[in-house]
Amino acid sequence: MGELEWFDAYCKLDNAPGAEEETLELIRKAEADAARKGVVGIRDYEMAENVDTWTRRFSAASPRPRDANDSAWTGIDWDGSFTHGIRGLRVEAGVYPERLEDAIEAGWKTGVELPGSDGLGHVGAMKMISDGSLNTRSAFCSMPYSDIFPDFYGTLSYAPDQIEAYFHGATCHRFAIACHAIGDEANTIVPNAATSTHAHGSIEHAQMLKPADIPRFAKLGLTASIQPQHAMDDRDVITRFWANPGGIPYAFKALHDAGVRLRMGSDAPVAPLDPWMAISAAVFGTESSDREPFQPEQCLDARTALAASTAVGRDRPEPGDPADLVLLDRDPYAVSTPEEMRAMPVAATMLAGRWTYSSLHGE
């Protein structure tokens, strides 16, 4: 089954009897777990009717108060009162190209607040997938997949002119773009489309880049949305299948040095929803002190990695910022091993001026 066929199948599953209630309960558990890790927001690029779905989720009523005996409390209402709808995360709900026309007709555009969300939910970017992935050998590359697949370069999900057409439609109707591009050839085609259409937004993953394309990201104002934990998961596969790459894999520091805005995430559920795993991978280039770093020349310093993990692109709040705060029990700039960074203890998390997690009772 291809991705577009899965899109329609997933939407039908999402609307099956009882699915919405069960999913909402799972989301409440997930947002509590996210708060324990210091997460205050997500971008939902699931192949689904995300705008309508999240509008319903923000308006749904919760059947349970928080557990007053929970020593490490998670929830929105500190007094234990009932919470209505999802209130533990900011959400940007992405729109796929196949649903873009419907979203435009409904009056949506990137940045519009979702009804009933109290400012926590907004319409996100138009999400588009230009190529495949490394592990499936379907990321579209300028060089073949080594001697194992000597005549195979990966695949494109859309022809370049189709990508350009979707970018044009999104841009004309005030949608940002968020385009998945992993192979180095895909990461040439996507900036080409952004150049001709004046599209703005992000390139998702940007895992393999030709050196000449890196400064283009900065020139075009495109954000590189990266998931450093993928480098840890893929390092052995990269060595096997991208032994003679046409570009630089996981070029974090090269992008930063070129002035490209970095935005770090997890790509959950592909990797766990845990920012400290991503930060650790970006800073140390390895999951274990017992293994040498992967591409140490592309590692980031801790301050840059932490800033890239925030919505505002800074590691410290400033007057006028939303009151989304994370209190830590350890100085992240004094950490010396990947194990310590991955185990970063979060003491409390605040979202929009309200605590969503705290282990500081009585202190």
Model-derived features with residue positions:
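Divalent metal-binding segments
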Residues: M1-R87, A93-W108, M128, N135-A186, ...
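His/Asp/Glu-enriched, well-ordered alpha-helical/loop segment
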Residues: K12-N15, E25, F167-A178, E185-G201, ...
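Secondary-structure transition/capping motifs at alpha-helix termini
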Residues: A60-D67, F82-L89, V112-G119, C172-H173, ...
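Phosphate/diphosphate-binding loops
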Residues: W73, F82-K127, G201-Q207, P211, ...
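Non-cysteine beta-strand/loop elements that form the S-adenosyl-L-methionine
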Residues: L120-S138, L222-A231
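Short, small/polar residue-rich loop motifs at catalytic or cofactor-binding pockets
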Residues: G121-H122, R342-M344
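Short, isolated positions in well-ordered beta-strands
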Residues: N135, T356-Y357
